[in-house]
Amino acid sequence: MSLMTQAWLLDKYGPRLNVDNLAEVLGMARATINNEISDGSFPVPTYRAHGKRWADYRDVDAYLDRCREALAA
């Protein structure tokens, strides 16, 4: 867990990120994210609330950490 990344995500997006925020942070197209969520292959857990799809900032941070570790290996 990177506290710097968590602090940055929380400051910029708040405690949860919508699909547009995820697209910006992960450098993915919104449609790709929606497709991966639909087929169950999106690497960050998401949930629906108030008609929108959300991801917790801690889960996004954990995914970014896994990516960083994979690049370092």
Describe the predicted segments one by one:
Residues 25-54, 70:
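Major-groove DNA-recognition helix of helix-turn-helix-type DNA-binding domains
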Residues 16-20, 43-68:
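Short helix-start
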Residues 2-35, 66:
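Polyanion-binding surface elements
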Residues 1-2, 56:
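Non-membrane alpha-helical secondary structure
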